[in-house]
Amino acid sequence: LKTFCLFLQIAVFIALGIQIFLCGTDALNNENELFSVEYCGANCTQQDNGSWTKCKGNCTCYHEDGKRYGLCLSTEYTDFTQFPKPTSEEIADASPRPKETNSH
């Protein structure tokens, strides 16, 4: 039962992350801006002293009020208007190329 509850919690948090992502991008309503949320593959817990276990890297602990457990998530906002528009040549240079094969 405890494993099922943990699985259910993770599913809810992932759904919440997706909802935040969709609401964030819809609220911006601008293709030049992007807000993304990713699950970092780890959980966090509240210690007896009230502090929370640390998440690694750029991840932050997100939890519901009153709960002693949460998920490590990374969030990122990108405003593409801060970058110049690429030229056709830059786009061509960045495009994937077919893999070259040696014939025998």
From Swiss-Prot:
- Location of the protein in the cell: Secreted
Q: What GO CC annotations are associated with the protein? A: extracellular region
Report if keyword Glycoprotein is assigned. Answer: yes
Cysteine pairings via disulfide bonds? 40-59, 44-61, 55-72
- Extract the GO molecular function terms from the UniProt entry: C-X-C chemokine binding
Question: Which lineage ranks, top first, belong to the organism behind this chain?
Answer: Eukaryota, Metazoa, Ecdysozoa, Arthropoda, Chelicerata
Secretion signal span: 1-27
Q: Which domain of life is it from?
A: Eukaryota
Arranged from A to Z, the UniProt key words for this protein are:
Disulfide bond, Glycoprotein, Secreted, Signal
Q: Specify where the region named Disordered lies, as residue ranges.
A: 85-104
Q: Main site of residence? A: secreted
Q: Does the keyword Secreted apply?
A: yes
Q: What does this protein do?
A: Salivary chemokine-binding protein which binds to host chemokines CXCL1 and CXCL8.
- UniProt-annotated glycosylation sites, renumbered to this chain: 43, 49, 58
Q: Which organism is it from?
A: Ixodes ricinus (Common tick)
Instruction: State what protein this is by name.
Output: Evasin P1174
